[in-house]
């Protein structure tokens, strides 16, 4: 089940607010300009889904985002516990960073933890199957896929080159709870 935990960026041990209610999560995140919605990820994709199959299964959802925001491209990221690069990929995005464009993800399988650093607070969003999240460009954040990642998400871009991570050098992520 999706979740949101809000902390002060000075108190990583004491949550200020928590919820597993999708509507409450969406309302809290809307206040900081983050889009969070529950969509239907109801297609059977199999054990190791081919990206083309995932795209074809959810093209109608992609088309909706393109029509709304004018996004230019999309792809699929799929991580499994047996991925030889899982530790390298996990550690890469566990450091606080920004992107020059929105970070849009639609989780069609599994889960991941987005952590946003805004307005003196840390917003930890547990995204699971059916969750759409859009993190605004230049938002300081990190992402935890867990030690045994198991998710498939559609990524939507204005421009794939704009999705380069710009690391802040702040080690704040080390102080906050991880996915596992």
From Swiss-Prot:
The record marks 102 as: May play a role in transmitting local conformational changes. Its EC number is 1.13.11.54, 1.13.11.53. The record marks 105 as: Important to generate the dianion. One of its GO terms (molecular function) is nickel cation binding. GO terms for biological process: L-methionine salvage from methylthioadenosine; L-methionine salvage from S-adenosylmethionine. Its cofactor is Fe(2+); Ni(2+). Binds 1 Fe(2+) cation per monomer. The keyword Disulfide bond does not apply. Pfam families: ARD. Keywords: Amino-acid biosynthesis, Dioxygenase, Iron, Metal-binding, Methionine biosynthesis, Nickel, Oxidoreductase. The keyword Ion transport does not apply. Gene3D superfamilies: Jelly Rolls. Pathway: Amino-acid biosynthesis; L-methionine biosynthesis via salvage pathway; L-methionine from S-methyl-5-thio-alpha-D-ribose 1-phosphate: step 5/6. Fe(2+) binds at residues 97, 99, 103, 141. It catalyses: 1,2-dihydroxy-5-(methylsulfanyl)pent-1-en-3-one + O2 = 3-(methylsulfanyl)propanoate + CO + formate + 2 H(+); 1,2-dihydroxy-5-(methylsulfanyl)pent-1-en-3-one + O2 = 4-methylsulfanyl-2-oxobutanoate + formate + 2 H(+). Ni(2+) binds at residues 97, 99, 103, 141. The record marks 96 as: May play a role in metal incorporation in vivo. Catalyzes 2 different reactions between oxygen and the acireductone 1,2-dihydroxy-3-keto-5-methylthiopentene (DHK-MTPene) depending upon the metal bound in the active site. Fe-containing acireductone dioxygenase (Fe-ARD) produces formate and 2-keto-4-methylthiobutyrate (KMTB), the alpha-ketoacid precursor of methionine in the methionine recycle pathway. Ni-containing acireductone dioxygenase (Ni-ARD) produces methylthiopropionate, carbon monoxide and formate, and does not lie on the methionine recycle pathway. Monomer. Belongs to the acireductone dioxygenase (ARD) family. PANTHER family: ACIREDUCTONE DIOXYGENASE (PTHR23418:SF0). This is Acireductone dioxygenase.
